[in-house]
């Protein structure tokens, strides 16, 4: 039986990530805030564009999200038309948005109350990594759900790690960003010193 995946959010990262899933032979349904983007995606890949989140996630085994920030996550996950209210019991929800650990913990709790598993899974590698299927994904959530989701995410990831419970993926991404910022600052100061020497 074919695995069904709903992919919510077709920005510069989500668009190619959803494409990798469709090209791997999974049954993919997409939704995007601007419907034209979803229609365009469906014209280029084997898969279907949906008019609502509820339609996209109905009967999905996995629901992937890749949106802007915390407020966008609240919009797509919560409410009567959101993911949590409409995904089938037992579905695994995987969020690739770079957001706060707090929102990840909140969504994990809400999902758990409906017998859904939630994994916060922010990505590193940028647009090129998404296009090449070479992202690094830092995950937080239940181990059993992670192991089920691993082969799905592997279609667009080079490295996948479970860092701990809900929120751990986001915390790890923050550590990564701090390390990169420190490296950039150090290089900048070194170059400035070299120019002055």
Where are these regions (language model features)?
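Rossmann-like NAD(P)(H) cofactor-binding subdomain of soluble oxidoreductases
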Residues: 53-58, 62-63, 70-135
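Anionic-ligand binding region
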Residues: 150, 172-178, 182-197
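NAD(P)+-binding Rossmann beta1-loop-alpha1 motif at the extreme N-terminus of oxidoreductases
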Residues: 1-65, 91, 96-97, 127
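Aromatic/hydrophobic pocket-lining residues that form π-stacking "cages" and hydrophobic walls in ligand
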Residues: 38, 107, 190
């Amino acid at each position: 039986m074919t695995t069904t995946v709903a992919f919510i959010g077709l920005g510069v990262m989500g668009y190619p990530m959803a494409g990798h899933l469709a090209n791997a032979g999974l049954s993919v349904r997409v939704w995007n805030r601007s419907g034209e983007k979803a229609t365009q995606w469906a014209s280029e890949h084997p898969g279907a564009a949906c008019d609502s989140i509820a339609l996209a996630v109905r009967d999905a085994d996995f629901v992937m999200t890749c949106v802007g920030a915390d407020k966008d996550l609240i919009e797509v996950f919560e409410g009567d038309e959101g993911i949590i209210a409409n995904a089938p019991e037992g579905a695994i929800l995987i969020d690739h948005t770079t957001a706060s650990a707090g929102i990840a913990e909140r969504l994990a709790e809400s999902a758990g109350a409906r017998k859904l598993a939630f994994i916060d899974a922010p990505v590193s590698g940028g647009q090129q990594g998404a296009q090449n299927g070479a992202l690094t994904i830092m995950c937080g959530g239940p181990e059993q759900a992670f192991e089920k989701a691993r082969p799905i995410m592997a279609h667009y990831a080079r490295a996948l790690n479970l860092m701990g419970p809900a929120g751990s993926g986001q915390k790890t991404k923050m550590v990564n960003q701090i390390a990169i910022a420190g490296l950039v600052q150090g290089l900048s100061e070194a170059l400035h010193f070299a120019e002055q020497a």
